[in-house]
Every structure is written in C-alpha cells, then in structure tokens.
Amino acid sequence: MRLVDSHAHLDVAEFDADRAEAVRRAFAAGVVAVLCPADLTRPESLPAIAGLSAEFPAVMAAAGVHAHQAKDFVEAHLDGLRDLAGRGAIRAVGEIGLDYHYDFSPRDRQHEALRRQLALSGELGLPVILHSRLSGADIIAAVDGERFARGGILHCFTEDWATARAMLDRGFLVSFSGILTFPKAGGLREVAAKVPLDRLLVETDSPYLAPVPYRGSGRRNEPAFVVETARVLAGVRGLPLDELAETTTANFARLFPFEKTGSGC
C-alpha cells in the first residue's frame, strides 16, 4: 500500500522533538510522500521543512501566507515566493485562502492576501493549496476573479457539495482530513462519496485533527495516521483500502510528480 499525506504542518513546534522520526514512522506505515506548507510569516517555518526535504526528498514544500496571518501580509512575502519558485524550492503556493470561522485576520486583509497570492501563482505557473472555512462562495469568486487556471488542492475540505463541484469544475483536487472519520461528519462523507475518484486526496493536517481512533486520546496527529482517513474514505467509496490508496497517490502524483519508491526516501 502506498499513500500520500497531501497536507502536514511538520514545521510547527509540536514536531520539534521528533520531526524526522515522524517522517520515518509515516514511511513505515506506507506513506510515500508528504506535502508540507510553510508559513512565510514565521521565519523558522521554511527551514524546518527544507531540512526534512534534504533528508527525505519525498517531503515536498509549499509556501504562502495563511488566512489567519493575512493581517501580516506584505509585499516582501510575494518577493519571497518568487525567489523560492525561481530556485525550485517549493512545489505550490499555499496554504492560502479564507477563514470566516475564526476571522483571526480582517476579511478585507484575507481577501487581499488571497488575491495577490493567486495572481502570483498564475504568474509562476504553480498550483495552489486553498483553505476555505465557511467561505466557499468567496473562494470560488476569488479563483474566478484572478482567472486562475493552474488548479491545485482544496485542502481539509469541510464545505458543501455545491462548493466541491464548483472547484472540481475549476480543475481542483479535493482533499479530506481526519474530520471525515468523526462520528458526526455524515454530511461530509456524503460529499466524499460524490467526488470523482480521480480527484480525491487524503491528508492529516498534522498536528491537528487526529482521526478516529486517535481523536480524543491526547495523541498528536502525524502523517502515519493518514491511513485511518484513507480507510474511512475507502469504505465510503466501497473500495479496498489498497485500491483507494493507489488511486489517491496517483492523483497527487499527476499534480506533483515524484518518485514513488516503497520507502518514501
């Protein structure tokens, strides 16, 4: 079985004590690649991911300014993205987007940061990793407003089927996190049942959103646990776990080609 964790925050302090070990545990569990978004507002974020990528080439980096940090977005962040892309140091721009649940940044600043980074992604020819929480209509409008055609990943999907369908129509893949395993996530599982197989991804969003059976145990989420989300998604789709794993891995590899070795190293 080969799986990809399409979104993990291995740069954060929760992994300072065992960052490399967490990657090794993931590989032992069947994970062959991990995509890690760096936070450009935290100077220590990208070096942490770059260190992992140097040791484990199947750990890939993205970078951007998240909706939560949009209040701190400045022009220099765009210059940084241009430099990173020019050096081949990132595979995508993200995680970027809108979050109307927490509203940690004013919405006008969220919109500005999203619009500017979408425009730059188009200029650079890079896909984006989008965050959308209670903001589906405005995410769609932003993508349309920038005429962004490169596609990418709608990560940790929790919106409705109408939003999923609209983003699928715009060339995006839809990624499901451990939320899919939660007992009260029946509506989300209904959406997951409708997404075309060739557009599905799985992720952990580590260290957050640990899937059942780890949810509530006090254990930090990590990439090895992506198998639990894949297991539930396989059940939703009526597929063997191995087939679902291979399908989602192939979907990821179309957007981010990589050497799919057995170990992920």
Predicted regions and their residues:
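Mid-domain alpha/beta scaffold segments of enzyme catalytic cores
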Residues: 1-265
